């Protein structure tokens, strides 16, 4: 039994006799209010909600009748009144509080049903500054916080999904709500207002271009409870921030089992990578395993791109994630369905493609209704012990003007196309990253090594293994190489030379750039500096 600050025990059951309803999302509110009214709960409401309930034949008192004060300033001030907040905050079993209520004719409010102005929708929907500010709710959060604080006597409902739960509890407890439920609803209300305020503060920081605000908050809504996290002994949930960026968080799952923690992490990595390639110009496919690409390719069709991507590392591709930058068609679906695949994510899928995928009942198909802009601003965050590392999203994209040829030999037109392709891929490979590419397809990928030369050697060996399995020569012969960061020594470049590469793209910026350039010239290698690093950890 919890007690108040005045050492007054909180009652287990609180009868609901009076409710205040004020909602922006009116989903289910008419039926919920009608059920309350059937239990002879007195209803008070505001503005559009009151009008809707009245039109639906439900007896309701306008909040101005409760307060004795009209709504003013275009509805900005309507519930910020002692008659409302006194009714929410009063400790019912405190004689002093009861006396104050009697003196000021304040009636207790037992149930508050509120959801907030749709600030997040306006923010991410491209509303202008004035419209976004106008959708910052003031009275709603104030009532939610007041009711949640006084959960000893008041129940607060913020989510239409909880209406049925509340009605079931009222039915079970003869019109009263139990303390545990009031606690849980209060916790949810505070989580909601915290996320709401986080969205507002984040929007202000973005609008004013404040890169490192003094306080930083993040909010999200539970989208899915996971069976477990990265490993079976870890608990996990997936939270959606409300950002409209096409991707795993906003995608529609057409079929397949529930996504796991690792599925979501890998699918996000896959789709972010494939969005580097403009679907209006080229078909592109990425195959991902453990958040690293094991094959990426461009093609004249998705099917061709998939076959080229798969050839890079067919062993690792088994049980992987496949991302496409165009509408999944039947030809590509047939190719993908030939091996075990966990998830396919694409902007859309034809009916024929969906029918093919449907034959693999456990294969998850996600449709995003578009591709993400790789240049779009945003934030990424990582937890560390006792803190958060927050940075802007790596939205750096190289243009031709960024490229600087630093060797005696310049890349050919074909080499340059492959260099730019490989560097796009390297951006999405865990550091240290080395990518061999040929004919606009990866042929060897080295990821996550502490030494860049080891990544170069692993990438070449992977290419050799794939070639040996296919009965051919390693495709690193005549390939190009991309590195996510500079070569600190010439050894990494020499490994690429040994593998048969003819051109290299890297950020540059090492103290030994001259040594690396000299080695490239000695071996007839063309090398391009981008001036942009893409570490990924």
Swiss-Prot record:
EC number(s) recorded for this UniProt protein: 2.1.2.3, 3.5.4.10
Does Translocase show up as a keyword for this record?
no
Q: Does the keyword Zinc-finger apply?
A: no
Transmembrane intervals: none
Which GO MF terms does the UniProt record name? IMP cyclohydrolase activity; phosphoribosylaminoimidazolecarboxamide formyltransferase activity
Q: In which pathway does it act?
A: Purine metabolism; IMP biosynthesis via de novo pathway; 5-formamido-1-(5-phospho-D-ribosyl)imidazole-4-carboxamide from 5-amino-1-(5-phospho-D-ribosyl)imidazole-4-carboxamide (10-formyl THF route): step 1/1; Purine metabolism; IMP biosynthesis via de novo pathway; IMP from 5-formamido-1-(5-phospho-D-ribosyl)imidazole-4-carboxamide: step 1/1
Domain annotation text? The IMP cyclohydrolase activity resides in the N-terminal region.
Its recorded name reads: Bifunctional purine biosynthesis protein PurH
Q: Name the species this protein comes from.
A: Chelativorans sp. (strain BNC1)
């Amino acid at each position: 039994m919890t007690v108040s600050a005045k050492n007054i025990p909180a009652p287990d059951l609180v009868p609901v006799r009076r409710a205040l309803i004020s909602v922006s999302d009116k989903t289910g509110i008419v039926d919920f209010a009608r059920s309350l009214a059937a239990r002879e709960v007195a209803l008070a409401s505001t503005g559009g909600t009151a009008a809707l309930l009245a039109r639906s034949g439900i007896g309701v008192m306008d909040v101005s009748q409760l307060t004795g004060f009209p709504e003013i300033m275009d509805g900005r001030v309507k519930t910020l009144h002692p008659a409302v907040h006194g009714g929410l905050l009063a400790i019912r079993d405190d004689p002093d509080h009861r006396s104050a209520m009697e003196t000021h004719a304040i009636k207790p409010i037992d149930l508050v049903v509120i959801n907030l102005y749709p600030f997040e929708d306006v923010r991410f929907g491209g509303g202008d500054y004035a419209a976004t500010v106008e959708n910052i709710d003031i009275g709603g959060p104030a009532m939610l916080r007041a009711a949640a604080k006084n959960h000893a006597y008041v129940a607060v409902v913020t989510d239409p999904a909880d209406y049925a739960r509340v009605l079931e509890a009222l039915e079970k407890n003869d019109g009263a709500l139990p303390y545990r439920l009031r606690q849980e609803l209060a916790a949810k209300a505070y989580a909601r207002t915290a996320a709401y305020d986080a969205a507002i503060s984040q929007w202000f920081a973005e609008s004013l271009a404040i890169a490192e605000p003094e306080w930083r908050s993040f909010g999200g809504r539970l989208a899915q409870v996971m069976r477990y996290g990265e490993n079976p002994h870890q608990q996990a949930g997936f939270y959606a921030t409300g950002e409209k960026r096409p991707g795993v968080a906003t995608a529609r799952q057409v079929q397949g089992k529930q996504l796991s923690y690792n599925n979501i992490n890998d699918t996000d990595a896959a789709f972010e990578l494939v969005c580097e390639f403009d679907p209006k110009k080229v078909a592109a496919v990425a195959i991902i395993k453990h958040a690293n690409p094991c094959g990426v390719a461009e093609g004249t069709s998705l099917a061709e791109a998939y076959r080229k991507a798969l050839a890079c590392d067919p062993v690792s591709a088994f049980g992987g994630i496949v991302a496409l930058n165009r509408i999944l068609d039947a030809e590509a679906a047939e190719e993908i369905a030939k091996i075990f695949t966990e998830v396919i994510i694409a902007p859309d899928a034809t009916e024929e493609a969906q029918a093919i995928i449907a034959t693999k009942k456990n294969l998850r198909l996600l449709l995003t209704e578009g591709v993400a802009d790789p240049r779009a601003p945003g934030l990424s965050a990582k937890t560390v012990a006792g803190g958060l590392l927050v940075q802007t999203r790596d939205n750096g994209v190289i243009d031709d003007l960024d490229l600087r040829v630093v060797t005696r030999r310049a890349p050919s037109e074909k080499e340059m196309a492959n260099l730019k392709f490989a560097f796009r891929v390297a951006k999405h490979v865990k550091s240290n990253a080395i990518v061999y590419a040929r004919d606009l397809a990866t042929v060897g990928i080295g990821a996550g090594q502490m030494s860049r030369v080891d990544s170069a050697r692993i990438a070449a060996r992977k290419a050799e293994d794939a070639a040996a399995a296919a009965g051919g020569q390693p495709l690193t012969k005549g390939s190009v190489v991309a590195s996510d960061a500079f070569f600190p020594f010439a050894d990494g470049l020499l490994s690429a030379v040994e593998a048969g590469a003819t051109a290299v793209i890297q950020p540059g910026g090492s103290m030994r750039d001259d040594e690396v350039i000299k080695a490239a010239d000695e071996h007839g290698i063309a090398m391009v500096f981008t001036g942009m690093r893409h570490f990924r950890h």
